[in-house]
């Protein structure tokens, strides 16, 4: 029904078109639009503007043309201003949708700091009882071993940026398997998921420069696909894409 009415209006418009060229077609359409609208539903001020837009003044009527130009300028400003408001609303809506999406995807537990494991039993319990979707990064260290302090500091920063990843640390002497983690293989990183060891890095400090920081450790773990996408980074990227648009 609606499609038939729209087609009929288009045919009527084609029959009433009297101008040629882009400006003539636009003026014909404005005039037809005004006539086809319910007169009671159009505010008087809008109706007057539509009339003026559909019936440009003659070049000899200087005063009328100036008045028309002023009204057109105001109308154009309002339209542009409204378009900008619409764009801002759309950006806010898309940003909110992205935030909602990340919240829905981030339905697992959140941590945000490095857990100190005191015993081997606590170590095993953490691996076995944590949710299967959670990635667990365990740093096995000892005081005084080169690279251990820097790695602990780096993991503390990463824990804040990746709250869905559980970062832990435990002294080799507290694991109950100190003979397996001698000083020459420290610091060691073990990565678990779903109760299974998925990556292990012995003497991991050798992968970095003499001085290394959180960004270096982050890049290293990302090379092996062990970290999820940072939530803050994803939202910033979305905001940048919206600004480009």
Swiss-Prot record:
Entry's localization field: Cytoplasm, Cytosol; Nucleus; Cell projection, Cilium, Photoreceptor outer segment; Photoreceptor inner segment
UniProt record similarity statement: Belongs to the phosducin family.
This protein's record includes keyword Cytoplasm: yes
Cysteine pairs bridged by disulfides in the record: none
Chain segments carrying region Disordered: 1-67
Complexes and interactors: Forms a complex with the beta and gamma subunits of the GTP-binding protein, transducin. Interacts with CRX.
Positions of post-translational Phosphoserine modification: 73
Key word Phosphoprotein present: yes
The protein, known as: Phosducin
Transmembrane segment boundaries: none
Keywords: Cell projection, Cilium, Cytoplasm, Nucleus, Phosphoprotein, Sensory transduction, Vision
Main localization (coarse): cytoplasm
GO biological process annotation, one example: visual perception
Domain Phosducin: 1-241
């Amino acid at each position: 029904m609606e499609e038939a009415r729209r087609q009929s209006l288009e045919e009527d418009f084609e029959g009433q078109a009297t101008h040629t060229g882009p400006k003539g077609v636009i003026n014909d359409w404005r005039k037809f639009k005004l006539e086809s609208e319910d007169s009671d539903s159009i505010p008087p001020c809008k109706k007057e503007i539509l009339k003026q837009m559909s019936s440009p003044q003659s070049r000899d009527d200087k005063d009328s043309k100036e008045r028309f130009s002023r009204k057109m300028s105001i109308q154009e400003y309002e339209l542009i201003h409204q378009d900008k408001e619409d764009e801002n609303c759309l950006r806010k809506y898309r940003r909110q949708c992205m935030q909602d999406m990340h919240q829905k995807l981030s339905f697992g537990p959140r941590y945000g700091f490095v857990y100190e494991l005191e015993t081997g039993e606590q170590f095993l319990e953490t691996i076995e009882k944590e949710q299967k979707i959670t990635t667990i990064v365990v740093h096995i260290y000892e005081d005084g071993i080169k690279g251990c302090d820097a790695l602990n500091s780096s993991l503390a920063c990463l824990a804040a940026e990746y709250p869905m990843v559980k970062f832990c640390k435990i002294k080799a002497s507290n694991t109950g398997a100190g003979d397996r983690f001698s000083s020459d293989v420290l610091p060691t990183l073990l990565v678990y998921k779903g109760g299974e060891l998925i990556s292990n890095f012995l003497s991991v400090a050798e992968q970095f420069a003499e001085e290394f920081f959180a960004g270096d450790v982050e890049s290293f773990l990302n090379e092996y696909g062990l970290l999820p996408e940072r939530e803050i980074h994803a939202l910033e990227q979305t905001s940048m894409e919206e600004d480009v648009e």
